[in-house]
Amino acid sequence: MSQNITLIKDKILSDNYFTLRNITYDLTRRNGKVIRHKREVYDRGNGATILLYNSTKKTVVLVRQFRVATWVNGNEDGMLIETCAGLLDNDEPEVCIRKEAIEETGYDVGEVRKIFELYMSPGGVTELIHFFIAEYRDSERASTGGGVEDEDIEVLELPFSRALEMARSGEIRDGKTVLLLNYLHMSHLMG
């Protein structure tokens, strides 16, 4: 028997930036028993992320920026090293990630390859992230990057081996970045 869901109540608690909803629903379990649940769900839209790599130089491009949620949760300076990423904002995932790559890193990359799409925190966040990789070349640098007006993004070109070590040691603590670095390592695209 499949699980059946009956929506009882969907109340918007806040929609100042994204939407926080309180959802009440009945869930029919596999054994037929109906259980009522009440959960808060944060809807921030879907996103995309990309890891830029250079197989000749054996480097990757990451960014460092302030993330308030990490600061609230004990990251002393709130800075996070991560892959370039952004919300889709009604764009197709590849269109979004190309725009974000130029804005954040300055690279106008050629071919991009979609790897997978994942829910990163499905217990309470609706966001589905589309994961990409792309090889970059120095000649594809269209600008210095750094983000748009209200962003302060530092562009980091790192040896791939160093980035992997940073992920292993906990210096890189962003889930999407650790996933993409490990994907690149397992795929042997860096030789």
UniProtKB/Swiss-Prot annotation:
Keywords: Hydrolase, Magnesium, Metal-binding. One of its GO terms (cellular component) is cytosol. SUPFAM superfamilies: Nudix. Signal peptide: none annotated. Its cofactor is Mg(2+). It catalyses: GDP-alpha-D-mannose + H2O = alpha-D-mannose 1-phosphate + GMP + 2 H(+). Pfam families: NUDIX. Gene3D superfamilies: Nucleoside Triphosphate Pyrophosphohydrolase. It comes from the Bacteria. Mg(2+) 1 binds at residues 85, 104. GDP-alpha-D-mannose binds at residues 17, 38-40, 67, 85-87, 104, 127, 150-151, 176. Mg(2+) 2 binds at residues 100, 104, 151. GO terms for molecular function: hydrolase activity, acting on acid anhydrides, in phosphorus-containing anhydrides; metal ion binding. InterPro entries: NDP_pyrophosphatase (IPR004385), NUDIX_hydrolase-like_dom_sf (IPR015797), NUDIX_hydrolase_dom (IPR000086). Belongs to the Nudix hydrolase family. NudK subfamily. In the dimer, the N-terminal domains are swapped between the two monomers, such that residues of both chains contribute to the active site. Nucleoside diphosphate sugar hydrolase that hydrolyzes GDP-mannose as its preferred substrate, yielding GMP and mannose-1-phosphate. Homodimer. This is GDP-mannose pyrophosphatase. It comes from Salmonella arizonae (strain ATCC BAA-731 / CDC346-86 / RSK2980).
